[in-house]
C-alpha cells in the first residue's frame, strides 16, 4: 500500500501529521507497508496463499500466532477483530484500507490516551516511540529504525500534498442490521432507558460511537 494512501486515511481518522508519520514509520518497520504480508518464518505459505486461505477459512487465522498485515497483528483477539471487521466490510482480511481503519478503531477503543496524544502531538520521534512501545509492543524495540522511517516519510509526504479522502476509505456498512438490532435489544433487556431507535446500519465507527454514548448517558 502506498505511504500517502495510508497517511491520508490516518489523517482523516484524526491523527496529527506527526502522529500519522509515527504510525507510518512503525508500519514500515513491521511490514514494509505490504498489507498482505505474513510473518516470515511462521508459515510455509506465500503471502497471497496465506491471505486466500484466511479469507476462505482454510487456516486458523485467529489462533495461529502468525503476525499479519501492516501492523503485523499477532495476538488472537486482535486478529479476530480484524477478521470480523473484514467480513462485515465484505473485503479481504488483507485489504489495506481495512487495516488502517482497524488500527484507528483499536486506538480509540483500547488505547484512548495514546490516541489523544497522536491527535495533538507535533513530535514525530515521540509519536513513533509511543506507538512502538504501547501499540505494537514488538520483541525488540528498534526505536531508532522506526524514527528513521517516520522522518523519511516526512520528506516524502509534504503537508501541502495532503488531501483528505472525499469519501470514507471503505464504503461497505458495519455492523450489519442484525448486529444493530442486537445492540438495541441488549440495551432494552438490561433496563437501560436509552433511545435506541437512532441506530441504523452504517459506518462502523458511527454505530459504535452512538452505542458508547448511549451507555454513558444511561
Where are each of the predicted segments found?
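Acidic helix/loop microenvironments that form the catalytic cleft of cell-wall polysaccharide enzymes
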Residues: 27-31, 73-74, 118-141, 202-217
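Short acidic, glycine/serine/threonine-rich helix-capping segments at coil-helix boundaries
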Residues: 166-181, 185-218
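Export/targeting segments at the very N-terminus of extracytoplasmic proteins
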Residues: 1-32
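Surface-exposed patches in mature extracellular/periplasmic domains of secreted proteins
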Residues: 14-24, 35-42, 113-123, 127, ...
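Solvent-exposed, acidic/flexible segments
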Residues: 3, 13-20, 63-66, 92-100, ...
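Solvent-exposed, polar/charged alpha-helical surfaces in well-ordered, non-transmembrane soluble domains
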Residues: 4, 8, 21-24, 101, ...
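Non-catalytic cell-wall polysaccharide-engagement segments
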Residues: 79-169, 173
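Peptidoglycan-targeting cell-wall enzymes and recognition modules
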Residues: 5, 31-119
Amino acid at each position: 500500500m502506498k505511504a500517502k494512501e495510508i497517511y491520508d486515511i490516518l489523517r482523516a481518522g484524526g491523527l496529527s501529521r506527526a502522529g500519522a508519520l509515527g504510525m507510518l514509520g512503525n508500519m514500515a518497520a513491521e511490514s514494509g507497508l505490504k498489507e498482505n504480508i505474513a510473518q516470515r518464518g511462521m508459515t510455509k505459505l506465500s503471502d497471497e496463499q496465506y491471505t486466500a486461505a484466511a479469507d476462505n477459512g482454510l487456516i486458523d487465522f485467529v489462533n495461529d500466532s502468525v503476525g499479519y498485515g501492516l501492523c503485523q497483528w499477532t495476538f488472537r483477539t486482535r486478529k479476530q477483530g480484524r477478521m470480523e471487521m473484514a467480513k462485515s466490510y465484505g473485503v479481504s482480511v488483507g485489504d489495506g484500507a481495512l487495516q488502517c481503519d482497524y488500527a484507528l478503531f483499536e486506538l480509540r477503543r483500547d488505547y484512548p490516551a495514546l490516541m489523544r496524544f497522536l491527535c495533538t502531538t507535533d513530535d514525530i520521534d515521540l509519536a513513533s516511540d509511543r506507538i512502538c512501545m504501547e501499540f505494537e509492543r514488538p520483541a525488540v524495540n528498534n526505536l531508532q529504525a522506526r524514527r528513521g522511517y517516520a522522518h523519511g516519510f516526512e520528506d516524502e509526504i509534504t503537508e501541502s500534498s495532503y488531501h483528505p479522502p472525499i469519501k470514507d476509505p471503505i464504503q461497505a456498512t458495519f455492523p450489519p442490521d442484525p448486529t444493530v438490532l442486537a445492540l438495541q435489544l441488549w440495551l432494552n433487556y438490561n433496563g437501560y432507558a436509552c433511545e435506541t431507535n437512532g441506530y441504523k446500519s452504517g459506518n462502523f465507527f458511527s454505530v459504535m460511537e452512538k452505542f458508547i454514548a448511549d451507555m454513558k448517558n444511561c
